Design a protein with these regions (language model features):
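Long, Pro/Ser/Thr-rich low-complexity/intrinsically disordered regulatory tracts in eukaryotic proteins
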Residues: 56, 63-340, 344-345, 356-701, ...
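Phospho-regulatory, low-complexity terminal regions
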Residues: 1-82
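Short hydrophobic alpha-helical segments that form membrane-spanning helices or hydrophobic packing faces
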Residues: 26-27, 41-48, 344-350, 698-704
Length: 763
């Protein structure tokens, strides 16, 4: 029979743990043995006095003169609870601890200064902190696996961090309508530490925290006086506790984490808060880090871009006069390992309704939230509303603008699923089993899905979809293999970006995390100069430029706005025709006879006519139409197919020179770009419904008949080029395999150059 622990013993243990007495006594004895002071009792009294604040000593009439002994803490292997599953427990073992316990940073901090968090807050996902800017250098081999897993990076492949490389411009208009009325709080923040000072958890003993506070106050107040920062009111925690408590409550300050990370030494001295006159900007001094600058958004005015740029301006101004602690690989160093890099964090408070009517197949709200990989989740009930308070930090593996968009998308998707799910839409996070295929497009889609599924399966677009919603039509055979997969809107490209990156790496060797697609990068290529009699051997040429208009879901979704798209395109035509009529529009409903004739004669295609089951709107041919360019009989436009507009050249047995038409195609694309804001992203270029066209949005199909050369000869000649050959019963078809990273003009020039060389070899 198991012996029961006496109640008195339980209470005694509880008392010792509450005041950390065993640890204090062991560290005091360690310090005494280290110094071997000839007056041990006096030494111990002074040691204990050093643990109290000056105010506490006065309160209890303790007059104990300085100097106080220097602490020599006992370095102990951290205690891990049975339920603890953090990264510290995963990567720390007793063998490695033998070496680590002997190491100190240049500020005198040891391994226990980083690991106390795991004992006080075993649920923390990481379990350790950085106590100063020298931690990574001193404990490199120990910390790197933890940083790599927390940030989903490989330090061996990590480029040097670009300090102060803030970008003010980014596009974040996704999903905000879904959040109206439900998003009660949204806060952006930057955290920084001053160089050559230990961080707040071990600054108190040598009064460094006071130096940091004095320095930061002087710099902030100078900037306010110069008008470089907004007018702000200052509060001192030791004098304005109630006011500061209200501010901390307003921003959902995580006091539990701060206490567990041992950041309340000498509390409340040398803690200050600045708040702007409009209450939207808050600056914290000496809380979790030396400096934290926050932007609070008004739930009725979610101007994300303006607020973000305002915050960037403040942190840039402070960077001019303050040197922050950085690492050449890991960027800005913060106490919280999740925050290193940009030091950027988002916190939000969103109301979710109907969570009991789960739209998630085989799962529940808690499982889903845990899968979302938020750093923190707190659930509060206020009246009839349940508030989900989540926060996340921008990891080293992600660019800040993409991180913000992803976070906003996730919130919008959650709101769509639970608050605005009028269709009763369900969503599944179970892996779909796809069969291997000989079709390279389909196989690349399959492989990209399988390799990134676990990473992105809980990622939601602003319309509440996940990657399975896009893969399911492929799985059921609703979408032809040559289209691969059809996305619904640009938010899906951001939410499923790991899948998109993987697919582009497989299909084109293009890494969107490293390279960018820049539209209009024409180099020095001249289409006209490539003309030649060899091109007369070409039987047909089809060139397509796919474009979608910003602010609308793609036509490949059922909730698109085809009527608005058609109206915008008609307005653009009126503007382009204002000087001279060069474009005629034929509606498939109002001008059916003429439109059908143009489609038949020029072999134009409407994919959407055959893709109703694949998620395409079923109202075909409503709001569809054809553009005819009057001076260029081989150039057309198709409205509201799988993209909002498709510019195309369709030349059968061309008798005329091709270059003028190719030049005009690019010109007309740019002309429409003046009046229509196309969906464009500098990483992936023009956002087309199918990722196989990303970048230029271009598809080229050129057919020719040869006398001598066989298909295998042509295929070999196109190796290491941007093109591939396909064997067709009527001839050889050359198709561009490259769509991203090069300009439209470059690809067209390279096409004609390669075709000329092939035909020369055939003559």
């Amino acid at each position: 029979m198991e012996k029961k622990t006496p109640e008195r013993q339980i209470q005694a243990k509880k008392y010792l743990d509450e005041y950390d007495i065993e640890n204090v006594i062991s560290e005091m004895l360690n310090s005494l043995l280290h110094e071997k002071d000839p007056h041990p009792y006096v030494y111990m009294i002074k040691y204990l006095a050093s643990l109290m604040t000056e105010d506490e000593r006065k309160e209890f009439n303790l007059e104990i003169p300085e100097p106080y002994p220097t602490a020599h803490p006992v370095v102990k292997y951290p205690h891990f609870s049975d339920s603890c599953k953090n990264l510290l427990k995963k990567y720390l073992n007793r063998d490695s601890f033998v070496k680590l316990k002997k190491i100190k940073t240049k500020f005198g901090n040891n391994i226990n200064s980083m690991t106390k968090l795991t004992e006080l807050l075993p649920d923390d996902k990481i379990g350790c902190i950085l106590s100063d800017g020298d931690c990574i250098n001193s404990y490199y081999d120990f910390l790197i696996p933890i940083i790599d897993e927390a940030h989903k990076i490989n330090s061996k492949k990590l480029d040097e961090y670009q300090i102060n490389s803030y970008s003010k411009i980014f596009n974040c208009d996704l999903g905000l309508n879904e959040l109206k009325g439900y998003l009660k709080k949204l806060i952006f923040s930057f955290s920084r530490n001053v160089q050559e000072f230990p961080f707040n958890n071990f600054s108190a003993g040598n009064n460094k925290i006071a130096e940091v506070a004095e320095f930061l106050q002087s710099q902030i107040e100078d900037k306010i006086g110069q008008g470089s920062l907004p007018q702000m009111k200052k509060y001192e925690l030791s004098k304005n506790k109630d006011e500061i408590d209200n501010i901390l409550k307003k921003i959902n300050f995580n006091e539990k984490w701060m206490i567990s990370a041992n950041l309340k030494q000498s509390w409340p001295e040398n803690r200050f808060v600045y708040i702007s006159n409009d209450n939207s900007i808050i600056i914290l001094i000496n809380f979790c880090d030396h400096l934290q600058v926050l932007k609070l958004f008004n739930e009725n005015d979610l101007d994300i871009e303006k607020g973000y740029n305002e915050l960037i301006e403040i942190i840039q101004q402070l960077s001019l006069v303050i040197t922050f602690e950085t690492h050449k690989q890991y960027g800005y160093l913060t106490t919280n390992i999740n925050l290193i890099g940009d030091g950027f964090k988002i916190l939000s408070d969103i109301i979710l309704k109907n969570t009991d009517k789960i739209p998630i197949e085989g799962s529940n709200i808690n499982e889903f939230l845990n899968g979302c990989n938020f750093d923190d989740i707190v659930i509060n009930k206020e009246g009839n509303d349940i508030h989900y308070i989540t926060s996340n930090s921008c990891k080293l593996s992600m660019k800040m603008d993409i991180f913000i968009n992803l976070y906003i998308n996730q919130l919008a998707g959650m709101s769509k699923l639970f608050n605005n799910n009028k269709e009763g839409k369900k969503i599944s996070f179970d892996r779909i089993n796809l069969q291997d295929s000989k079709d390279i497009v389909f196989q690349n889609i399959k492989d990209a899905y399988e390799e990134t599924f676990d990473e992105i399966k809980y990622n939601l677009s602003s319309s509440g979809t996940n990657i399975n919603n896009r893969i399911e039509p492929v799985f059921k055979g609703y979408i032809p293999n040559n289209l691969g997969i059809l996305f619904k809107d640009k938010s899906e490209y951001l939410s499923f970006s790991p899948f998109v990156r993987n697919y582009l790496l497989k299909s084109q060797g293009f890494d969107i995390n490293i390279k960018e697609h820049i539209h209009g990068k024409e180099e020095n290529y001249n289409l006209v100069s490539i003309e030649g009699e060899e091109l007369n051997k070409i039987e047909s040429l089809h060139v397509y430029l796919f474009r979608n208009i910003d602010g609308f879901s793609f036509p490949s979704s059922k909730d698109n706005s085809n009527d608005q798209i058609e109206k915008l395109i008609k307005e653009a035509i009126v503007n382009i025709n204002s000087k001279e009529k060069i474009i005629e529009y034929y509606s498939l409903t109002e001008n059916k006879t003429e439109a059908d004739k143009i489609i038949k004669e020029n072999k134009l295609i409407f994919h959407c006519e055959k893709l109703v089951n694949g998620g395409i709107d079923s109202d075909f041919p409503k709001n569809r139409g054809i553009l005819k360019f009057l001076n260029f009989p081989y150039i057309f436009g198709v409205v509201n197919d799988i993209c909002h507009i498709k510019f195309c050249i369709s030349m059968q047995n061309p008798k005329e020179k091709m270059s003028p038409h190719l030049v005009h195609l690019v010109k007309m694309n740019n002309e429409f770009f003046r009046y229509l804001k196309f969906n464009y992203n500098k990483q992936i270029g023009f956002m087309t419904a199918s990722p196989i066209y990303l970048g230029t949005g271009m598809r080229i199909e050129l057919k020719m008949k040869l006398n001598k050369l066989r298909f295998e000869d042509v295929k070999k000649k196109l190796e290491n080029t941007e093109f591939v050959a396909e064997n067709n019963k009527d001839g050889i078809v050359i198709i561009n395999k490259t769509t991203i990273g090069e300009s439209e003009t470059y690809l067209l020039c390279k096409l004609l150059e390669n075709v000329k060389n092939i035909i020369k070899n055939d003559l």
